[in-house]
Design a protein with these regions (language model features):
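Short, polar N-cap/turn motifs at the start of nucleic acid-interacting alpha helices
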Residues: 76-79, 173-194, 221
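Short, basic (Lys/Arg/His-rich) helix/loop patches that form interaction surfaces
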Residues: 46, 121-126, 138-180, 187
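C-terminal catalytic core of Y-nucleophile DNA break-rejoin enzymes
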Residues: 92-115, 122-142
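C-terminal secondary-structure termini that scaffold catalytic or DNA-interacting sites
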Residues: 2-21, 208-222
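Catalytic-site neighborhood detector that most strongly recognizes the C-terminal catalytic loop/helix
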Residues: 90-92, 182-207
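Basic, Lys/Arg- and aromatic-enriched nucleic-acid-binding interface segment
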Residues: 24-66
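Conserved tyrosine-mediated DNA breakage-rejoining catalytic core shared by Y-recombinases
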Residues: 38, 71-112
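Short, charged phosphate-coordinating catalytic segments
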Residues: 2, 59-81, 176
Length: 222
């Protein structure tokens, strides 16, 4: 049975039921800002199947939304410059077209992408085998429950995006680079993401083990 370090989220578990004026009921999470601590992520990732790992490795290494990742083709990966072009984005240009975003990724992730392309025999125009959003959310909750994360209900795939941004901030990566990477303003980042003091030295070393040399040469923690 996995045993995790105590963290400040343990008192923010649970959900509450909301009743609409039409009588319909739905539930909302008490804590929508949950992110993974590195020991939680490593245990979660190790419990996934090989196919499931493709989705979640893309998410944690890019910080992209799952719909953005699902629309990435092999030809969108720049193997020489360690970057990925995101063409299907949430942000729009004035003419209504989607605003393209280029994401830096680590050389370690690029190496993994090459191996994945070979394993699945993908061609330049092929998409990567990314799970649907409902399937990814179900997979995440089932796996987190299996590995005994007490507040597993607080997670959705979007929390992986929150996790990478939180990690990069904790590593003291330049805030402008972080905001450009995730496609939102520094104000949004400071409002919804945590301070660098959340993680200790051991946590930060573990984060580097997970995300490799992503923004490694931009100063901050190494």
């Amino acid at each position: 049975m996995a045993k995790f370090k105590t963290n400040h989220f343990t008192s923010l578990q649970g959900s509450k039921e909301i009743i609409r004026t039409n009588g319909m009921k739905y539930t909302v999470r008490q804590n929508r800002f949950r992110y993974f601590f590195p020991d939680e992520w490593m245990t979660f990732y190790d419990a996934l199947s090989s196919k499931q790992k493709v989705t979640f490795n893309f998410l944690i290494n890019t910080g992209a939304r799952i719909n953005e990742v699902r629309n990435v083709c092999v030809q969108d990966v720049d193997f020489d410059r360690n970057s990925i072009i995101i063409k299907w984005t949430k942000a729009r240009n004035e003419d209504g077209s989607r605003k393209m975003r280029v994401l830096s990724v680590s050389p370690q992730f690029i190496k993994w992408v090459r191996a994945t392309i070979k394993e699945y025999e993908l061609k330049p125009a092929d998409h990567f085998p990314i799970l649907s959003t409902p399937a990814a959310n179900i997979c995440m909750k089932k796996t987190l429950r299996k590995i005994n994360i007490p507040d597993w209900l607080m997670f959705s795939v979007h929390n992986v995006r929150k996790t990478l941004e939180t990690w990069l901030i904790s590593l003291d990566v330049d805030s402008l680079k972080v905001s450009k990477h995730f496609g939102h303003s520094i104000t949004v980042a400071s409002k919804f993401y945590v301070s660098p003091d959340t993680f200790n030295f051991e946590d930060k070393r573990a984060i580097r083990d997970i995300i490799g040399e992503l923004y490694y040469h931009q100063g901050g923690f190494r």
